[in-house]
Amino acid sequence: MFSMKKSLLLLFFLGTISLSLCEQERDAEEEEGSENGAEDIKINRVVKCSYRPGSPDSRCK
């Protein structure tokens, strides 16, 4: 019975560590995505404004 408790406790701790590592990796990917997303918006804004020079569109300012 004691060895079974040890095994379950070990599995619990390994699962907790694995979950923690996955969350850290996901957070890092989200941060990368938000940085790239901001740059994509800037590029998109430049492209739209270059097609309509002099347009009164507020996004082109």
Swiss-Prot record:
The keyword Secreted applies. The keyword Signal applies. InterPro entries: Frog_antimicrobial_propeptide (IPR004275). Residues 23-45 form a propeptide. Keywords: Amphibian defense peptide, Secreted, Signal. One of its GO terms (cellular component) is extracellular region. This is Odorranain-A6. It comes from Odorrana hainanensis.
